[in-house]
Amino acid sequence: MKQKVIVGLSGGVDSSVACYLLLEQGYEVEGLFMRNWDSATNNDILGNRNINDDICPQEQDYLDAKAVADKLNIKLYRVDFIKEYWDYVFSYFIEEYKKARTPNPDILCNKYIKFDKFLNYAINQLNADYIAMGHYAKVEFNKTTNQYELIKASDTNKDQTYFLSQLNQKQLSKTLFPLANLTKEQVRKIALKQNLITANKKDSTGICFIGERSFTNFLQNYIPNQTGDIVDIKTNKVLGQHIGVMYYTIGQRKGINLSGMSEPYYVADKDVKKNILYVCSTSDQSYLHSTSCLVNDINWILDISKYVDDINQFECQAKFRYRQIDNKVVVKKIDDNNYQVIFKKPLKAITIGQQAVFYLNDICLGGAVIDKVIK
């Protein structure tokens, strides 16, 4: 009897090809299109260029997913996780921004929606043996350690293990990543050869519910402007006005709106209580560097005692944003939920609220939220 796989069919080329490959491998395949955002329900008006369109981008994605399902002769279901997304992902996202932190909603979406609500729906409602996604990542079972390992994809430029760092053993045991050993170019070639409508569809970029528009406009739907001073962190001189410290991220250069300066300025720090945005000039970028950070809400994907000699202090690599190169670090345990991450060399623009994701070569060990940056 064939094993049944429910694919998260999003209307993009990656999930389309994932469906095709699984069919070729002999699985029983069905698609499930999920909708996590509703602009009307969520009062998403400001800057939303699609608000009056006859067909919103999400509905077009569904039509593309349906066309792929029809082409491959598989069933396609659809399900809404709009309330769940708001409760588990978006509420946290907004609360973090109100604190002038910079969260990563894609990581939370994977943890709570795609690999939890979606997974449970696929297994309990659609009788799936596995789910599959169009992510670029690998899952392998290590018989020596008796652990499912999340491993970097062959296409290192597209590798998405950073976004999957909050998953657990149960989730990995039920997940297939058919694109693990393919490059994006190879995926598009397969889609073209199979005449899939999504073959040349543009990749989605940025945060899914914002789309192609001003991030500031989007946030203004939920957080009111709070004007304050922009201050040179070195001289303490007021250089201008900002519209709210939550709209800026550490290391940001564009959009600070400081005119008449002799050189570019970067966001160096944020004081939420005083509502001050601190900036530094290009020649003073040392203010962007730090030597370590404190992290919490740690998630170890696997039993790290089977991978490191001393779980209280060990060396590994870490990424502090997507597509960043691996950085050598020492991870030092403070208690069960708090760790210090010491950098082998100073790093630039480490951002509170973002994820620190840990690797042992190509194996993703897990991730944690950056809570404090130590200069």
UniProtKB/Swiss-Prot annotation:
SS bond partners: C109-C208
Entry binding sites for ATP: G8, L9, S10, G11, G12, V13, D14, S15, M34, G134
SUPFAM superfamilies linked: Adenine nucleotide alpha hydrolases-like
Organism domain of life: Bacteria
Cellular component, GO annotation: cytoplasm
Region of interest (Interaction with target base in tRNA), ranges: 104-106
UniProt keyword annotation of Signal present: no
Site (Interaction with tRNA): H135, Q354
Example GO BP: tRNA wobble position uridine thiolation
InterPro entries: MnmA-like, MnmA-like_C, MnmA-like_central, MnmA-like_central_sf, Rossmann-like_a/b/a_fold
Swiss-Prot/TrEMBL catalytic activity: S-sulfanyl-L-cysteinyl-[protein] + uridine(34) in tRNA + AH2 + ATP = 2-thiouridine(34) in tRNA + L-cysteinyl-[protein] + A + AMP + diphosphate + H(+)
Keyword flag Cytoplasm: yes
Protein name, entry field: tRNA-specific 2-thiouridylase MnmA
Active-site residues per Swiss-Prot or TrEMBL entry: C109, C208
UniProt region (Interaction with tRNA), positions on chain: 158-160, 321-322
Organism: Mycoplasma mycoides subsp. mycoides SC (strain CCUG 32753 / NCTC 10114 / PG1)
NCBIfam families: PRK00143.1, trmU
Transmembrane region(s): none
Enzyme nomenclature, EC number: 2.8.1.13
Top enzyme class: transferase
Cellular localization per UniProt: Cytoplasm
GO molecular function, one term: ATP binding
Purpose of the protein: Catalyzes the 2-thiolation of uridine at the wobble position (U34) of tRNA, leading to the formation of s(2)U34.
Keywords assigned by UniProt, alphabetized: ATP-binding, Cytoplasm, Disulfide bond, Nucleotide-binding, RNA-binding, Transferase, tRNA processing, tRNA-binding
Family statement drawn from the similarity comment of this UniProt entry: Belongs to the MnmA/TRMU family.
